[in-house]
Amino acid sequence: MSLDISNYPLLALASTPEELRQLPQSALKQLSDELRQFLLTSVGISSGHFASGLGTVELTVALHYVYNTPFDRLIWDVGHQAYPHKILTGRRDKMHTIRQKNGLHPFPWREESQYDTFSVGHSSTSISAALGMAVTAEKEALGRKVVAVIGDGAITGGMAFEALNHAGDLHKDMLVVLNDNEMSISENVGALNNHLAKLMSGRLYTTIREGGKKVLKGMPVIKEMAKRTEEHLKGMVVPGTLFEELGFNYIGPIDGHDVNGLVETLSNMRDLKGPQFLHIMTKKGKGYEPAEKDPIGWHAVPKFDPTQFRKPATKPGLPTFSQVFGKWLCDIAAKDEKVLAITPAMREGSGMVEFSQRFPQQYFDAAIAEQHAVTLGAGFACEGYKAVVAIYSSFLQRGYDQLIHDVALQRLPVLFAIDRGGIVGADGATHQGAFDLSYMRCIPNMVIMAPSDENECRQMFYTGYCYNEGPSAVRYPRGSATGAEQIEEMTALPIGKGVMRRQGQKIAILNFGTTLAAALTAAESLNATVADMRFVKPLDEALLLELAASHDVLVTVEENAIMGGAGSGVLEFLASKNRLKPLLQIGIPDEFIKHGGPEEILSELGLDAAGIEGQIRAFIER
């Protein structure tokens, strides 16, 4: 994507932070405007995360202007807001490739740039990483500064507060910037806080404050009185008491779209000792009216024309698996008021908007707190309620101990609706749902289901709802369903029983999940038997023994890591019965899968029809 210098005269001069720092401060306002316009244009071409980046343009410019990056360490939490950072750190001309196969990574990524000091994608990790870097910076004594940027959503995660607590205790030199795009403050209060922030971050205030501490060191009563007076005065206009109590010097809130004000405040704070906390107010979607009005809807966008001020119309088509879940949840809640559903800040993505509106007393958003969400469900189940935890596969990893200790160990009937199982595509390695079958299969008392289509998915949700002997999980992929007819009537499936889908000879394909259509297509060319296993745990042992006895070769197919997955379960069972046959496991290899289109990734992994057939033929010919 070449840069039209006539439209971006200053941005053309700031390809890297080193070039940015050569510009006069008076040019930063225009540079920010050009950067925001370039972001609009580039995301319109590429698709991707949108509203968050529009809100951090001025902050990004100010941070790279004040801090000596990459020597100074800058860590972005999650990374949705880091597109301006990528543009200013040598990747401007590749922005049209972001989230595409062999293109720029969707998040800051250490392997991609020296300016990406910590690879991210999941929430609430930045402060812990920054503290680790601050500790080592002190040991090296090179004068390196460390900054973590975290949003008001990510800071709700427990890990962020654990890190804040530890950072306050260790008292290392570091800065945490809270990008707050939720709170609304009036202009008067905002102006007061902007002035107060400059005053309190300035050298005069800091010198008086630290000098006063030394003078009053021998007079503890007066020192305590002075401390309380300062806290009281700050508390009247500054909502930062919590962070002060954690050991941080709190500054703010200030206007996050005043680039010159940010530069002044950051310049003052850069050399302050100990943990610093800067609270800035921004507007998600800043500078693009549709995104300002609907920041959730414009959080991530497909390719679009920014001049049209609307996203392209969605073509009517098949429902997504998330929508199938949302409809089932509404249907069952209408019949049972003891159904309580939980999501860790993924209402829209998990298909729960309608449910939250129709059944607000049965809906719980636990925020970005997966550990809490899982154990909250355990608490519901203890009291005889039916807990449904809707969670992404890659995020359930963060509540793994709770899944084992708080749910499975107590055999609590919590139903996990695990979205984004398998390949998710453009969000890349941090979000691929490659491990859930493996990490759940080893947990005692778990029932794990993998539907082959949307109707089977609906019936499995009902099966989990009816199951009261312990926890159950239904894992399903991102995106559109298969087009199977959905049967409104809900019927509980027999636990641990698969079904035959095609009778063939010599080769038996044991399919787990939505790869069934590809497996059936491959089976036509191979004249292979196909079984829709349905249950990863417990396995249909009778069906496995029957297929092993009547076929020469067994093949397992799953959109999950081969290591420890459903195929491993089949192999373990047959070995325990001394009924081993040549067995090919088809799935995700032992590597992190990069970003790209889901179809092209599945094809590359050999998980489409041609790939399944090719792998089976190669296995037979060995």
From Swiss-Prot:
<dbReference type="Pfam" id="PF02780">
    <property type="entry name" value="Transketolase_C"/>
</dbReference>
<keyword id="KW-0784">Thiamine biosynthesis</keyword>
<dbReference type="InterPro" id="IPR005475">
    <property type="entry name" value="Transketolase-like_Pyr-bd"/>
</dbReference>
<feature type="binding site">
    <location>
        <position position="370"/>
    </location>
    <ligand>
        <name>thiamine diphosphate</name>
    </ligand>
</feature>
<dbReference type="Pfam" id="PF02779">
    <property type="entry name" value="Transket_pyr"/>
</dbReference>
<dbReference type="GO" id="GO:0008661">
    <property type="term" value="F:1-deoxy-D-xylulose-5-phosphate synthase activity"/>
</dbReference>
<feature type="binding site">
    <location>
        <position position="288"/>
    </location>
    <ligand>
        <name>thiamine diphosphate</name>
    </ligand>
</feature>
<keyword id="KW-0414">Isoprene biosynthesis</keyword>
<keyword id="KW-0479">Metal-binding</keyword>
<protein>
    <recommendedName>
        <fullName>1-deoxy-D-xylulose-5-phosphate synthase</fullName>
        <ecNumber>2.2.1.7</ecNumber>
    </recommendedName>
</protein>
<dbReference type="InterPro" id="IPR009014">
    <property type="entry name" value="Transketo_C/PFOR_II"/>
</dbReference>
<comment type="function">
    <text>Catalyzes the acyloin condensation reaction between C atoms 2 and 3 of pyruvate and glyceraldehyde 3-phosphate to yield 1-deoxy-D-xylulose-5-phosphate (DXP).</text>
</comment>
<comment type="pathway">
    <text>Metabolic intermediate biosynthesis; 1-deoxy-D-xylulose 5-phosphate biosynthesis; 1-deoxy-D-xylulose 5-phosphate from D-glyceraldehyde 3-phosphate and pyruvate: step 1/1.</text>
</comment>
<keyword id="KW-0808">Transferase</keyword>
<feature type="binding site">
    <location>
        <begin position="121"/>
        <end position="123"/>
    </location>
    <ligand>
        <name>thiamine diphosphate</name>
    </ligand>
</feature>
<feature type="binding site">
    <location>
        <position position="152"/>
    </location>
    <ligand>
        <name>Mg(2+)</name>
    </ligand>
</feature>
<comment type="subunit">
    <text>Homodimer.</text>
</comment>
<dbReference type="GO" id="GO:0052865">
    <property type="term" value="P:1-deoxy-D-xylulose 5-phosphate biosynthetic process"/>
</dbReference>
<dbReference type="GO" id="GO:0019288">
    <property type="term" value="P:isopentenyl diphosphate biosynthetic process, methylerythritol 4-phosphate pathway"/>
</dbReference>
<dbReference type="InterPro" id="IPR033248">
    <property type="entry name" value="Transketolase_C"/>
</dbReference>
<dbReference type="GO" id="GO:0005829">
    <property type="term" value="C:cytosol"/>
</dbReference>
<dbReference type="InterPro" id="IPR005477">
    <property type="entry name" value="Dxylulose-5-P_synthase"/>
</dbReference>
<feature type="binding site">
    <location>
        <position position="80"/>
    </location>
    <ligand>
        <name>thiamine diphosphate</name>
    </ligand>
</feature>
<feature type="binding site">
    <location>
        <begin position="153"/>
        <end position="154"/>
    </location>
    <ligand>
        <name>thiamine diphosphate</name>
    </ligand>
</feature>
<dbReference type="InterPro" id="IPR029061">
    <property type="entry name" value="THDP-binding"/>
</dbReference>
<dbReference type="GO" id="GO:0030976">
    <property type="term" value="F:thiamine pyrophosphate binding"/>
</dbReference>
<keyword id="KW-0786">Thiamine pyrophosphate</keyword>
<dbReference type="Pfam" id="PF13292">
    <property type="entry name" value="DXP_synthase_N"/>
</dbReference>
<feature type="binding site">
    <location>
        <position position="181"/>
    </location>
    <ligand>
        <name>thiamine diphosphate</name>
    </ligand>
</feature>
<dbReference type="InterPro" id="IPR049557">
    <property type="entry name" value="Transketolase_CS"/>
</dbReference>
<dbReference type="InterPro" id="IPR020826">
    <property type="entry name" value="Transketolase_BS"/>
</dbReference>
<dbReference type="GO" id="GO:0000287">
    <property type="term" value="F:magnesium ion binding"/>
</dbReference>
<keyword id="KW-0460">Magnesium</keyword>
<dbReference type="GO" id="GO:0009228">
    <property type="term" value="P:thiamine biosynthetic process"/>
</dbReference>
<dbReference type="GO" id="GO:0016114">
    <property type="term" value="P:terpenoid biosynthetic process"/>
</dbReference>
<comment type="similarity">
    <text>Belongs to the transketolase family. DXPS subfamily.</text>
</comment>
<feature type="binding site">
    <location>
        <position position="181"/>
    </location>
    <ligand>
        <name>Mg(2+)</name>
    </ligand>
</feature>
